[in-house]
């Protein structure tokens, strides 16, 4: 049994001051994936005994960035998608393991007034193609902040957010296309009708207190792994970021 954790830490240095190390040890994951590390190399000595660590930093300081801590030494590690326009923001890390690929991703936000929506659409197509190419060789597990609430059940206030980044028809359609290409939303696999479970809450308007959240952090797996899925969990009780960790357990 393997346990995977994914957490958008909204700045790892800040999260360190809010109990990150305790959470890391308590969750005891085989693979612990981070998004929005917001740091450069050498700014934090984040090493954990028994784990190999891999970092992809954005060129812009204090922005984006991903990391993976792995108990298993991978066969290979790839940073980015291998596409120039997508590979300056530290958004993707791929580990090749014996029987699967693990990808962590911090999907670009479409931003206010949807000024980055066109770029986001291109990213979605290129990222999906990247995953499908990997899948020709081995099954894929992809986790991270995908910056989209897929269905109305995935956010507290769907009606008022229809035209907002993360819940536009365009973004939701791309997510549907990704699933239809052969991927399983593992949380919905186990809890297809569960309402009121979210992974991100705005820091404004006491959103977390009111549970006015969005489920935008996911574990997706190749459909071929469905019969190996053992559990999915969203750790809504864990603080330290505006997101909470999400979990997948799988028999591999």
Regions found by a protein language model. Give the residues of each.
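Structured beta-strand-rich core segments of catalytic domains in phosphoester-bond hydrolases
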Residues: 38, 43-110
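Surface-exposed cleft-lining segments at the edges of enzyme active sites
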Residues: 82-83, 108-124, 159-164
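Active-site-proximal beta-strand elements of phosphoester/diester hydrolases
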Residues: 2-10, 99-111, 143
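Metal-dependent phosphoesterases centered on the DNase I-like endonuclease/exonuclease/phosphatase
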Residues: 52, 126-212, 216
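Active-site beta-strand termini and strand-to-loop segments that position acidic
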Residues: 71, 95-98, 222-223, 241, ...
């Amino acid at each position: 049994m393997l346990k995977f954790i994914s957490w958008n830490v909204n700045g790892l240095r800040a999260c360190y001051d809010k109990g990150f190390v305790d959470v890391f040890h308590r969750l005891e994951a085989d693979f612990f994936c981070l998004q929005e590390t917001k740091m450069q190399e050498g700014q934090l000595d984040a090493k954990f005994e028994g784990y190999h660590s891999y970092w992809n930093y954005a060129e812009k300081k204090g922005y984006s960035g991903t990391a993976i801590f792995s108990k298993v030494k991978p066969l290979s590690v790839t940073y980015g998608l291998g596409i120039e326009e997508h590979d300056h923001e530290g958004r993707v890390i791929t580990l090749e393991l014996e029987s699967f690929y693990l990808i962590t991703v911090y999907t670009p936000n479409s931003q206010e007034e949807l000024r980055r929506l066109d770029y986001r659409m291109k990213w979605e197509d290129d990222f999906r193609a990247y995953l499908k190419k990997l899948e020709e060789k081995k099954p894929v597990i992809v986790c991270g902040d995908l910056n989209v609430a897929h269905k109305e059940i995935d956010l507290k206030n769907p009606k008022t957010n229809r035209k907002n980044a993360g819940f536009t028809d365009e973004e939701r359609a791309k997510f549907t296309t990704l699933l239809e290409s052969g991927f399983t939303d593992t949380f919905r696999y186990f809890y297809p009708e569960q309402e009121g479970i979210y992974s991100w809450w705005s820091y404004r308007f006491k959103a977390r207190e009111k549970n006015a959240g969005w489920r935008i952090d996911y574990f997706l797996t190749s459909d071929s792994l469905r019969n190996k899925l053992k559990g999915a969990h969203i750790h809504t009780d864990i603080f330290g970021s505006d997101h909470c960790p999400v979990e997948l357990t799988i028999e591999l």
